[in-house]
Amino acid sequence: MVKYLFGHVTTESTSKTINVVASSKTKLVGENQGIPNSPQKTIALTAAVGKMVYLDIEVDNEIFRCLGTVTDIKTHNLMMTSQMESVGAKETAGALPKGEDFRKLTFSIQATFNRPPGETKWKKYSSALPTSPETRTAVYFLDDETVQEMVDEDDIYPTVGFFRGLDTAPQPLAIPDFGGNTGATHSAVIGRSGSGKTATYTYILGTYMCHEHHAIMVIDPQGQWSNENGMVMSLQGMAESLGRPVSVLRVAEDIKLPMDEEIFSRMVSKLNLWKKFRRMGTENLEAFSDAVASGIANLPYSEYDKPPRDLLSKVFGSIANSSSALNRIYTRGDRQDAFRDDLLRLAGLPIIDPDTGEQALVSKEDEEEVEKNWEAILSVFSPLINLFSSTNIDGGKRHSLGGSYGFLKDVFQVRNANSGPAPYVILDMSPSTKIHAAADLMGGKDAGLNMQKILDNQDVKALILMMVLDEMKRASETAFATTNTGNLNTQIVFDEAWRFAPEGKATPEIEELAKKLEGFALDTRKFGIGWSYILQSPADLKTGIWRQLTYVYVGYGLVGDDVKRLEALTDDVKQLDLYRQFIPPKSTGIYPFMLMGPVSPIIFTTAPAFVNVFNNNQDYLHYNSSWINKITERRSMPRITVEKLDPNRRVKTPKQKAVQVEKQYSVGNAKTVSTPQTTIKEPVVSKKIIDDDPDLVEDMPF
């Protein structure tokens, strides 16, 4: 075994901190170091800061091995006394005696293993040595072979990159499984744009798949995880290749939202649905939105599948004929009467003169005004009510999240040894590619193609997320209550968390969602549901959530107060000096990350681990091949290739598709329907579409 000698223990070392003196010019490489007459040679001194080192000592016939990280190093020279330095300030450097440089440092012990006499396996011992080491004890650089000695070969330790400064030694990770009695843990990945945080967490999520019963659900506000555009690796391809069910659920197309009267009313108000119908005060508008939401919520769900104009006409007529509803909107008689007449015109109902009892005549100008109002209202209401209907705007089927037949029943389950692999699910909150393309072609004017405007509204998206989270909470509580055999073992990843779970002032909808997320993190952990948040700064995350985090993965770019906030997560703040030395990945192509929390099996303290994240899928597959191949072999599946993890191979070419676009033109109560043919380019963006068009895909991973 080759060891790379770094230096030797010097005086004043303790059982917790080791003082080391290293040569300033060379280091020794020896075969069987420590054995007399073993071969040795010298090589050039290499960088030391940021690398892990170790030493062995013998106590009571047992071998103890401690490990630590070099955080800084200082140069010394016994000839360079303060007096000589003063002389050197006035004379040339050549006039000074050279002496001999040496380097000195102190590192804190982060883990200690022991090996009893006669045994070959190392055991975890403590975060300190049983005694201080002798001076001149050799200190070596950590290498891959030594790491493999330390970890139990029976345990699964995936990896996402190399030890910092050791490009041949992968950093093993103790990836937690949430199926035990301890419950789940929460985590966050943080870094500025370009730090590689999405790529890093893509690899981390891939390593979680070593636990076959660990379900993963990604809440995807922008559609990045569903379409995998710009991703370093296809997690969908990874999951499929490991035998996991994969689902991409798009709010715009696939999910039928549960009707919530209060939230629907707030959506209507946020979308300013009535702005072209009538000028109304804020309180009047809110009361009207409440009345409409109440009317819709009290209708059977089957009504939501009817033409939006028919549905809303029925609600308008009900409000117009309800004195109590009108009184809540307007108290003044003249305004109330005028408002009632406007509703009756929109509903296509007769207006009766209270004095004569005769039906008021409807002029051509009135009819034209009604149609203009309907066009403005339906441009917003049609896509909004479609989120609650059984079919999407393209005629595809929507399904509920909750209930016995909802999507979530396959996510929140207590799994056992006989269960199949847990699913990988992406909940896409963005407008779908189809809807974007069609809306662009139609100039955004068609009422059925304005879903983009709704789902691009951050406050409306927050309201939708509230409904989704409530469904998730109900489904998880039901699943957990129906069994006493274990936890739900699920991880929920929340991308763009800084938008929806911020600390500080935001819109009422965002603040309410953030508070709800804080409560869910606390309540669902005991069910075995862990949350992971992707954001740019620790200050962007609500404090109540931040305090619940067990793991924090930090990429390049944090400064000032953000770094100070990280100090509370470790008892060795000197380690953060290594983080401050990170350089922009854009300039090097290397993505350094600091992993905080009990993530490394060879660190027993709160000190972070440092890793250079893989920048290619070939390395990821190679260094994770042990656990990946065990799964594929057990399930009689082919081995995973680099090509199967390429996110850019999922689509062969854009597809030309004829889309039926229905426009309705109304004159009075008569309607004329025309169905022009429109051709749009539509990328294949979901498994549903791929199933319909198998010729579009070559060598797909599912």
Segments the model singles out, each with a brief description of its role:
Residues 113, 222-226, 431-434, 498-499, ...:
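Conserved nucleotide-binding/hydrolysis micro-motifs of P-loop NTPases
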Residues 588-702:
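Conserved P-loop NTPase motor module
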Residues 79-80, 225-230, 257-258, 500-502, ...:
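Switch/connector loops and helix/strand junctions flanking conserved nucleotide-binding motifs
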